[in-house]
Structure formats: C-alpha cells, structure tokens
Regions:
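Patatin-like phospholipase
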Residues: 7-52, 60-286
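Sec-dependent signal peptide recognition
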Residues: 1-7
Length: 286
C-alpha cells in the first residue's frame, strides 16, 4: 500500500500552486498540524488540492473554504472531536475486512451535509480500482453529495482492514494500494509549485508486540507505505532551468513512535506533533 499522491497538472497560468496530502489514517491530524504551521510561515493561496487516503479527507474538507486558514481551524476542531467509534466498528462482520467502515460513512455524510456551500477549490482524489488494477483519479467537486462520501471512503479503504467500496460502478480500495507517491509531470511552460504535506519521513522502528490480525495488517500497511518505491528520490533535479519545485513538509519518524494509524482518539496530540515538529525539504523538478 502506498499513501502519498502528488499529481502535477498542466496549467494556463504562469504558476500553479498545488497542495498535496499523503495518507496515513489517524495521522491525517498530523498533516493538519503541519499545514497550520506552514501557513503561519508562508500564507499561500492554492489553485489545486490532491489527496489519497486520509489525505483525501483533508483535501476534500479544505476544498469548501475560500480561506484555507478557516478551513484548517475547522479541521482541527473536527480531529479533536473524532473518536474511533466514529470511524470504524468490529460488527457487523464484512467477511472481507477486520473492521466495518459504516461509522465513517455516517461521519462523512454528517460532515458534508453541514457545509454551507459547494467546494470552492479544484480537488483531485485517487483510489485503487480493484477491477482494472489501476489508480483512478476523480474530481471531488464534480460528484454529488452521496458520491463525494463514497469517493472519500474509496480512497480510505485500506485492504484487509476496511472493506472495499462500490463507487461509479467499480470496486475501490485505498488509493495508496498502488501509489504512495505518484508523480506525473505534464509541463506546459508554467512553473509548478507543490506543497506536499505528509507525516512520513522514513519507517519508524517498532518492536511492539503483534497480538491480532488487526495489528498485523496495520504493521504491514505502515511498512509498505514507507518503503514501496520512492519516486521523490528519483526526481530529476540536475537541470539549469527547473520547471517547478516540490516543498515537502513532514515530521521526524521518532515523534510518531508509539502512535497507531488506527487510533483516532488522540487527535489533539497528533495535531500538536505536526505543528511542533515540522521539517522541510525542497526538491527541484526538471
């Protein structure tokens, strides 16, 4: 499974400011903490949001706000209120996963129904098509309310942990199953400025005992999302005239030691970890 989406698109403007979120379950709260700090340092306005898994939830939520700082403030409140019981349950059994995501469907439906307007920022969300084996990318704002929820859930359906989701006559699982860091560059003589928010630096050494199938699936997801193919490392940076840049913001691995991507009861702690431990790396795109 891979939990990062960086999709670079052509633009008719001189510079495209894009905000991209990776995935990571409850670590989506870390991303909001990171973004809050980044915006305090440089208050940007973005033209495009992208996200996979938990990043899809963050991107979709923020797309409703013309003022991203107001969106961040409300996202903080949301993560402070979210508990495990609002995301998943063990019963009823699905037969294809250890957890049932019906509570997440209810939570997302309630969240979107409370929005005073439609999305205001173009937002792309990725999910893995279990029929074609491909990563499908959808425009969030083009979906009706029901399908907005299903699209978010499709991107968050970690195989084995959450059940796959029927959406658009297809069957979907977590977007990170195929692409943790998908970098597709289509350049049209415009400067690409990517702000990439992720909780991940490298894999966190973890010798915590594995006592259940849920623990095993969670550990496997963490290992794969941090180690399976790293397109960022292969970015072409040896050029005199770059076509853009990617600014990656993350937290050191050790600050997340002891935290679990399926534990949504620690939203306040995770937001603070993101806010107080931001690390920045800049990559040139050729």
């Amino acid at each position: 499974m891979r939990y990062l989406l960086i999709l670079l698109l052509t633009s008719v403007i001189s510079a495209l400011n894009q905000l991209s979120f990776s995935g990571g379950g409850s670590f989506g709260a870390v991303e909001i903490g990171i973004l809050k700090r980044v915006m305090e340092l440089e208050n940007k306005k973005f033209d495009l949001y992208t996200g996979i898994s938990a990043g899809a939830l963050n991107a979709g939520f923020l797309s409703y706000y013309s003022d991203i700082n107001k969106g961040i403030q409300n996202a903080e409140s949301l993560y402070l209120s979210i508990k495990n019981r609002m995301i998943y349950d063990v019963l009823p059994l699905t037969g294809v996963s250890v957890l049932n995501s019906k509570p997440l469907e209810k939570t997302l439906t309630k969240m979107l129904s409370s929005m005073p307007n439609q999305p205001l920022v173009h937002t792309l969300i990725g999910a893995t098509n279990l029929y074609s084996g491909k990563l499908d990318i959808y425009s969030f704002e083009d979906q009706d309310e029901t399908n907005k929820v299903l699209l978010m859930m499709s991107s968050c359906a970690i195989p084995g942990i959450f059940p796959p989701i029927q959406f658009n006559n297809q069957l979907y699982a977590d977007g990170g199953t195929l692409s943790n860091e998908l970098i597709e560059v289509e350049h049209d003589n415009n400067y690409l400025n990517i702000t990439f928010i992720t909780p991940y630096e490298d894999y966190i050494y973890d010798n915590t005992a594995i006592k259940s199938l849920k623990d095993m699936l969670c550990r496997t997801a963490m290992i794969v999302m941090n180690n399976f193919n790293d397109p960022i490392a292969s970015l072409n940076q040896n050029c005199k005239v770059p076509i853009g840049e990617m600014n990656k913001y993350y937290v050191p691995s050790d600050v997340l030691r002891g935290y679990n991507i399926l534990n949504f009861d620690k939203g306040n702690e995770l937001i603070n970890i993101g806010y107080n431990n931001v690390v920045h790396k800049r990559y040139i795109i050729c």
